[in-house]
Regions:
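Conserved donor-binding loop and adjoining core beta-sheet/short helix segment
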Residues: 2, 7-11, 28-102, 208, ...
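Conserved active-site tyrosine of GNAT-family acetyltransferases
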Residues: 120-124, 271-272, 276
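Glycine-rich acyl-CoA binding loop
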Residues: 93-94, 239-244
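Short amphipathic alpha-helix that is part of the acyltransferase structural core
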Residues: 1-42, 149-184
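Hydrophobic beta-strand residues of extracellular immunoglobulin-like
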Residues: 57-60, 202-205, 248
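Conserved GNAT acetyl-CoA-binding A-motif
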Residues: 104-115, 254-266
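Acyl-donor-binding surface of acyltransferase catalytic domains
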Residues: 75-79, 86-154, 281-290
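A mid-sequence, solvent-exposed acidic-amphipathic segment
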Residues: 171-221
Length: 290
């Protein structure tokens, strides 16, 4: 039996946060966990939409030596659950993780599993779960030469340049099709968003007349895999190739630091046109207790 430990006190950045982040970094290049990169976890924990009051539903699994070997988690919204992440494919561990989900979710239980995680998928099938929705993880090989051209009047921020946090907020807000002016965060959310200023979050911006028009964030901290999130262009500058420019520039900067590939969780044609191909698929497995 593995011990189960709930995420404590519904606090974003407690001691367990560091443990989970380190764990996800260790398994980042493991194919069956690639859909929940540590960058996705960091983005989630700093996000203003995070369901903070449900954080204690996330659980850590430890072996008899107290070593962290797995986690069952949701992503940002509690409705986007559950992800089973593990460093070992022991059937006893995976069975215990599945049991946690079925006991926690009365009625309908859902688990997101990478189809490369063959042992977990087989256990889900044997437990009466049905495979339903599919999502893709796309990848691009960074041994390629990724070049681009910016339209006249635009330029990119230099790697070591200071970022205008208000412009950064505006490009994300308008890039996700919100109108008007975003509210300044306060309290806990403001503190959480400060976490996004870490160096492992590589940020590129396409700029015109001092205003940020497009942005790509890439998460990288060693290993083979860099993670792309988010990618946005403000509505008035779409269709100009800015998205391609900021993505290629961001992943080229990760390549300079040692990344061999970059991944994104998406099925969008935009990424296919950038030369990305399917790395794996993630299915939602559903079981009803009714």
């Amino acid at each position: 039996m593995y011990s189960i430990e709930n995420y404590k006190d519904n606090i974003r950045f407690n001691k367990q946060y560091g443990e989970i982040r380190k764990f996800l970094q260790i398994i980042a290049d493991n194919g069956y966990n690639e859909h929940f990169h540590w960058g996705r976890f960091d983005w989630m924990m700093a996000h203003s939409y995070l369901d903070v009051e449900m954080l204690s539903k996330n659980v850590l699994f430890r072996n008899e030596n107290g070593e962290f070997v797995g986690a069952v988690m949701y992503d940002t919204s509690f409705n986007d659950r559950w992800y089973i992440l593990h460093s070992i494919s022991d059937e006893n561990l995976l069975g215990q993780m599945i049991e946690y989900v079925t006991k926690t979710d009365v009625g309908i239980a859902a688990i997101k599993a990478n189809l490369n995680d063959t042992i977990l998928c087989k256990l889900l099938e044997n437990a009466g779960f049905e495979k339903q929705y599919l999502e893709s993880v796309l990848q691009i090989d960074l041994s390629r030469n990724l070049s681009f051209q910016l339209p006249q009047g635009f330029y990119l921020n230099a790697p070591a340049s200071e970022i205008d946090n208000w412009q950064w907020r505006l490009v994300i807000y308008h890039g996700f099709d919100h109108e008007g002016i975003p509210q300044e965060p306060s309290g806990e959310v403001a503190k959480a968003e400060k976490h996004l200023e870490i160096s492992e979050y590589i940020k590129t911006f396409a700029i015109k007349d001092g205003e940020y028009a497009a942005h790509c964030g890439v998460w990288y901290n060693g290993g083979n895999t860099a993670y792309i999130e988010p990618v946005v262009t403000v509505p008035e500058h779409r269709g100009k190739g800015l998205g391609k420019a900021v993505v290629y520039e961001a992943i080229n900067r990760a390549k300079e630091q040692g990344a061999k590939r970059a991944i994104v969780l998406s099925d969008q044609e935009f990424y296919i046109h950038l030369g990305m191909t399917k790395s794996s698929e993630v299915s939602t497995w559903v079981k009803s207790s009714k």
